[in-house]
A protein has these predicted regions:
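Periplasmic polypeptide-binding modules associated with outer-membrane biogenesis and secretion
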Residues: 1-181, 193, 211-224, 384-386
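Strand-connecting loop/turn motifs
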Residues: 75, 143, 170, 201-203, ...
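Gram-negative/organellar outer-membrane beta-barrel architecture
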Residues: 111, 127-327, 495-507
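Extracellular loop and loop/strand-boundary signature of outer-membrane beta-barrel proteins
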Residues: 123, 178-180, 213-216, 254-259, ...
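Transmembrane beta-barrel strands of outer-membrane/channel proteins
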Residues: 150, 175-179, 192, 206-212, ...
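Residue-level signature of outer-membrane beta-barrel architecture
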Residues: 196-198, 232, 274-276, 320-322, ...
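C-terminal outer-membrane beta-barrel translocator/porin domains of Gram-negative envelope proteins
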Residues: 298-439, 443-447, 451-453
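Predominantly the C-terminal beta-signal and adjacent terminal strand-loop region
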Residues: 473-508
């Protein structure tokens, strides 16, 4: 169930107007209908005026206050009204005229279906939050823009929802080029992808991408991978399925006999989300999912059996998004539990104090974006991203949180990292728009810390770095580049004095 009601400051501050005469009303209530349970707060509100003398102005003021509150709670086509009644008996009631959705339909010449995207249904009580969720489901599809008109129905209080869709580019191609790779496997990395909007005509989304190193061909080092993604709305729910397969190979030259080390990683995730609450400036979703991973490691093509991994984990979390004036705050908290389904036990599972695949882990993230006024018509933008991981038991390295690189602590080249069972990363950024060009320069300051049993084998636990960058877009192209510097690192931790990073992407 989606909650849309809350206590109202305007009702709490309401007072009856002063007037002479009136009737002594011992009982005030809302006349019951099939939807009265949605408006139980009206009875609570009215009970506060029982035993008082109320005249015509007072009754009209109550009606106005209740209808304003109904509107504020999103029931934009519902209202209360006053039926003829004898007030001399000391009883007074309001009658509810519920706003019912009598029909939902597409505008003419629109193909596809609205049924799985609609968060409202025929015969339901119309709430504007349901329309907003429906719009989100339609507009979640790239190249698709929805508008919903509320038109009067045949009966008083009834309404018809007319959905108008604008669609463009149902199929698009995209590519990226960056230098996020490792020296041993290829610094230059490339991605090519295909995205299809509405592949099943159900406001769904599918994309496929291939990625790999972009350096001269060699059998002795490199990476390549495949990603699949499918997403479909189901009213107040959403289902997402993703799959990733990555291969890498590198030559180990510092041994007596050089050899090729390689590996394969697969990751499959099924996620379900459900809208718990939606208000004018916030929404909350319940999240649940299952994550399955496999890992294989090889030396000169021969698998290292002891390093083989096949794990499954369940996830349960909550996601909250809130607008506070012109700022956005978005947070997520997830509990992850390793389970034996479709999984193989780890070599040290069940050993006290050793790594296990049956772990309990908490993960969280917080995103804040807020404008920083510096002149009447000019603002900077501050962004903060915080995420953490807390494992309650020792876990295998594949579950570690790693810091030191462009996606964690900028200013480090990523060739060496600090990784452990638990940790926290905070990324701060101040962006300066360059007029209305769609470009900006930005400064970044990042901090990361890892902790857990494995830190005893590390050179240290903390990294701090900074960066100065430039990003923007022009036509189908987007670009981002920055120079980063390490500020604080453990003694002996090897990284470049300056890190140069870039990313170029295009979509057609």
């Amino acid at each position: 169930m989606t909650r849309t009601d809350s206590s109202s400051a305007s009702l709490e501050a309401f007072s009856l107007p002063e007037e002479d005469g009136g009737f002594l009303l011992k009982h005030l209530y809302l006349k019951h209908s099939s939807f009265s349970h949605r408006f139980s707060w009206v009875d609570t509100f009215l009970s506060g005026f029982e035993g008082k003398r109320i005249g015509r102005k007072g009754i009209q003021a109550l009606e106005t206050a209740i209808n304003k509150e109904i509107m504020d709670r999103g029931y934009v086509t519902s209202r209360v009204y006053i039926e003829p009644q004898d007030l001399s008996k000391g009883t007074f009631y309001f009658t509810l005229l519920p706003g019912i959705v009598s029909d939902i339909r597409f505008s003419p010449d629109t193909w596809g279906t609205w049924r799985n995207a609609a968060a409202v249904h025929k015969g339901s009580l119309l709430n504007i939050r349901g329309i907003e969720q429906t719009l989100d489901n339609f507009n979640h599809v790239p190249g698709q823009k929805a508008h919903i008109r509320i038109e009067p129905g045949e009966k008083e209080g009834d309404c018809v929802l007319l959905i108008e869709l604008q669609r463009e580019r149902p199929v698009s191609l995209f590519m990226t080029l960056d230098n996020s790779g490792m020296k041993e496997t290829g610094k230059l990395q490339q991605t090519y992808g295909l995205r299809i909007s509405n592949p099943l005509s159900m406001n769904d989304l599918f994309y496929f991408s291939w990625n790999g190193d972009a350096e001269p061909g060699s059998d002795r080092k490199g990476t390549h991978g495949v990603n699949l993604f499918y997403d479909i709305p189901l009213g107040k729910d959403r289902m997402t399925l993703s799959y990733a397969h990555d291969d890498y190979r590198q030559t180990v030259d510092y041994s007596v006999v050089p050899f090729i080390s390689s590996g394969k990683l697969e990751r499959t995730r099924l996620t379900w989300s459900h809208l718990l609450q939606r208000k004018a400036y916030s929404k909350t979703d319940l999240l649940a999912g299952i994550l399955h991973k496999t890992r294989h490691s090889y030396i000169d093509g021969t698998e290292i059996g002891v390093q083989r991994q096949k794990t499954t984990a369940l996830e349960l979390g909550i996601h909250h998004k809130r607008y506070i004036k012109e700022s956005l705050v978005e947070g997520e908290l997830t509990y992850r539990r390793g389970v034996p389904w479709l999984a193989d036990p780890g070599p040290t599972d069940g050993m006290a104090g050793e790594a296990t695949t049956r772990y309990n882990m908490y993960l969280g993230s917080l995103h804040v974006t807020t404008p920083v006024p510096v002149a009447e018509d000019y603002r900077l933008r501050y962004t903060m991203d915080l995420y953490f991981q807390k494992a309650n038991q020792p876990v295998y390295g594949s579950e570690f949180l790693s810091i030191g690189g462009r996606y964690s602590v900028r200013g480090f080249d990523g060739e060496n990292t600090l990784a452990a069972e638990s940790g926290v990363v905070m990324r701060n950024e101040l962006a300066i728009p360059l007029g209305k060009s769609g470009q900006e320069i930005y400064g970044a300051w990042d901090y990361g810390r890892v902790y857990g049993p494995s830190t005893q084998y590390l050179l240290g636990k903390e990294l701090t770095g900074c960066a100065l960058g430039f990003r923007g877009e022009k036509g189908p192209f987007r670009y981002d580049g920055f120079i980063g510097w390490p500020i604080e690192k453990p003694e002996g931790f090897q990284t470049a004095k300056r890190t140069y990073c870039f990313l170029i992407s295009a979509e057609i």
